[in-house]
Amino acid sequence: MKSKKLFFTLFVAVFMAAALLFLFVGNVANVYASQTQETINWNMKDVWQNKTSRDVPAFATYDAMIECAPRAGFTALGFYDYEYPELLTGDVYEGTNVVNNSYYAFYDEYKELMELMKQLSTGVTVRNFKKGLTEYVERRGRSVTFTSVMSKGTADLTQCIFAFAAQKPVVMFLDGFRYVMHHEEVANRDTITYYTEEDVKHAVLVYGHILFTYDYTTRREYYLVNSGYRGNVKMPIDSFLDVDDAYIIDIT
């Protein structure tokens, strides 16, 4: 799908976290964030995008730093509630537009998912993330499958793009990343402010991909994510992105 701007979009719903324990996703300890800024002057800018046809809900939670894994799972539930309204009580969507981004509206279900995932002060293991989400979905008469998209130590972008086209989000478990705090587009200049998180654990629900090309040569690729404390942001696909594990989530 080509537009005047050459746009590929890999949107993610991101959930910030850090951890001391390697197997755990989500803990406030050991986080380091640095800020950098990049300015790109251009004569022509193209953008390509590929994303699910509807956005994911941006559920907020009390503790964004340790609840990233249940938040990622709960966002997947909200996304699939569009097709299977028995997953959550209340309305998440009106048409394809998200009308309820408050987890307080689904408090009982969120707490149930946290308990099923065995949420601890150190976070949630990938194994318990999958087991907890599976049990939650099966209690409501549905099933969930997890298909790995890992290849050569990272998430395979092509598999992810095919998943988005099939209306399936991808959960990623990260050991490091950075995200766009601000992207200003004025005249023929893009100014991008990045925050880098190193030595962290963090869970992300990805639902699209975006590629900017400037003057045919300079490329910037991103996952668009929901960060919990920053809302929807772009997460660069670059050397800072360290994917430990990743799965397509398919609820039927």
Predicted regions and their residues:
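Extracytoplasmic/secreted envelope proteins and their assembly/folding machinery
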Residues: M65, A69-L77, K130, T134, ...
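Catalytic cysteine-centered active-site loop
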Residues: T96, R139-A155
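Active-site signature of cysteine proteases
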Residues: L157-T158, A165, L174-T252
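Substrate-binding/catalytic groove segments of enzymes
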Residues: Y84-E86, R140, V144, F212-T218
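Sec-dependent N-terminal signal peptides of Gram-positive bacterial secreted proteins and lipoproteins
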Residues: L6-N27
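N-terminal secretory signal peptides that target proteins for export/translocation
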Residues: M1-K4
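Structural recognition of the beta-strand scaffold that forms the well-ordered cores
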Residues: E67-P70, T75, F146-S148, P169-L174, ...
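Active-site-adjacent structural segments surrounding the nucleophilic cysteine of cysteine proteases
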Residues: F24-V126
